[in-house]
Amino acid sequence: MRTLPHKLFAVTAILAIFPIIGPGSAAQTTKKKPKYNVLFISSDDLRPELGAYGLKDIKTPNVDKIASRGMRFDRAYAQYPVCNPSRASLLTGRYPTETKVMNNNDYFRRIDPSTVTLPQHFKNNGYVSLRSGKIFHGGIDDQVSWTEGGEPTDPNITERGNPNFRPTKPANSDPAQAQAQTAGVNIADSNSDRIVVLDGDGENHGDYRTATRAINFIEKYKDRPFFLAVGFVKPHSPPTAPKKFFDLYDVKKIPLPVDFGATPKALAGAPEISISPRNSDLFIGRESTPELSREMKRAYWASTSFMDAQVGRVIDSLEKNGLKDNTIIVFFGDHGYHLGEKGKWSKAYSLYELGLRVPLLIAMPNQKARSTTRIVELVDLYPTLADLCGLPKPTNISGDSLAPLLKNPNAAWDRPAYSVTQYRQSLGRSIRTSRWHYVEWDEGKSGAMLYATEKDPHELKNLSSDPKYAKTIAEMKQLLAKMPVIP
């Protein structure tokens, strides 16, 4: 359990969830609680900008379908704004300062071989644990966690080896045509900073094959309780999709952010360290003009819609095999992403709202569409799924079950979200409450930020140096002091 104060107890969480999951509570029957399957879907670099989140211009009908029968978490946060540390955290139920995974190359089990991961916990309790696509990280996986699918991640799926990006080429397309689709960037210059238009339906792309493998797993194990993790790479750079998904969007109608910049730069009043001066994914070493930025954002949206189509193929298979009513579906992004805000086209090192906030949906069988504005964290997924499926409570984890919020979106919940990043040998820490977002680097020695998030959702005005907010900053520091630190 986390050390932050709260009034939730394990008994409350367990009892509260039974009405959601239908008949079969201990008070009503002596039948053994059924083992629900878990379909655990992740998307890389995905912002909470989906139809289900109110952005109707972005076409994501299949993810929206998950939301239509589940809980939408409007304020869910990653614990680290980079893939490997974030995934290691949520899959172990521990904060990055506990896993000590603070970059894209560390492997959590080298640090703590005794760790029991989320899929491993299900595997140890009678489930078949299955992996398709990118779940832990490209080039880094954890074979002991899986019954099947634990082989090293295919770089053709993840588009990333370790530590360098691998080339991604449009399937069976003419090189000259592909070159014309790179928003002015030579393909040879960067495997990440380009736009890729696929032929056909994208059958040869890694995400399409990830969905196909997941479908095969569903058909193979439909008669056994399973934990199936499906990791889609898109919309991670390079933004990639078949042409029909680009055609969904009129580039002239794509908006630019209020704090758009040609190059990455912290706004006046914010510490320089808060924004890396060089993009690491898109617009690397070059300016992002409004015209090129709209083209890139269109490609990101097209890539999101392509990923959504693959989600639909997996959901359709679940329903085709009669598993809709006994499967919990989780859909989430692994961290946030900047699309030109403050000139940044990446997520790396960003402790801003955009770097940390993620989409999170949890659909229980027979549940209606609802939403909650309570602050939650990805580190909560491990204890939540163990709770919902009646597994023994995992030990040595820091997350808390979200079962009470699935029962009542307005349940008492006084938990903030804690996130960290390491940049230039400096440790940045973030605490997010319902009203405030506070960030400090090296305990404030290298800078700090305080934003009144309701009044300033774009985080334009840093209040950390205003003496009127000294009491608020002291309270935020007290919350940070209760969180794990690196020994």
Regions found by a protein language model. Name each.
Residues T12-L15, P23-D442, S446-M449, P457-V485:
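Formylglycine-dependent sulfatase
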Residues M1-T12:
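Bacterial N-terminal signal peptides that target proteins for export
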